[in-house]
Amino acid sequence: MPKVMSVVAVVLGLVVSAVAGCSSSPGSPKQQLIQNADDTCRTINKRFAGDLAYGQGLGAGDASKLRERVNLLKALRDQVRKMPNPGEGQAQLDSWLDKVGVYITGLDDLRGQLQNYRLGMDLVLALQMGVNEDAAKAVGPAAKRFGFEECAKTQKWEYLAS
C-alpha cells in the first residue's frame, strides 16, 4: 500500500506540474497576444509615470513628451495588429484598438495645440486635456474586457501632479 501511495503522489505531482506549466506558458494566439501586449504596456505605464509624466502642469516644453507618448502607443497598436488573430474576442480587441486610436489622436491634437500655443488658448488646452483624460479612462475597461492586465492600467496616463 505505501508503494501505491508513493506512485500516486509522484503521478499527481507530475500532473500538477504539467498543468501549472501549461497555464503559465501562453498557448493560444489570444494568450500570446495578451502576454506580448501586456509586456509592452508595462513599459509604457512605467514611462508615462516616469520620464514622460506631465508633472505639475503641461506646457510647450512637453510637446516632445507627447510625441514620444504617441510613438509608443502607435508602436503598441501596430504590434497588436501584426499578431495572429486571437481566435476569440476579436470584437473586444477591435474595441480596445479603437479606443487606443482615439487616445492617440487626442494626444497628437494636444501636441499640436502646445506647439502652436497663443495667448488665450488655455481653455482650449484644458478642454483637450479633459478629452484625453476621458479617452485614457475608456482604454482601461476595454483592455480588461479582452483580457489584458497591464494594458488596462491607464489610471495615471493623464495624471497631473497637484
Task: Locate predicted features.
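Alpha-helical segments in soluble extracytoplasmic regions
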Residues: 30-114, 121-161
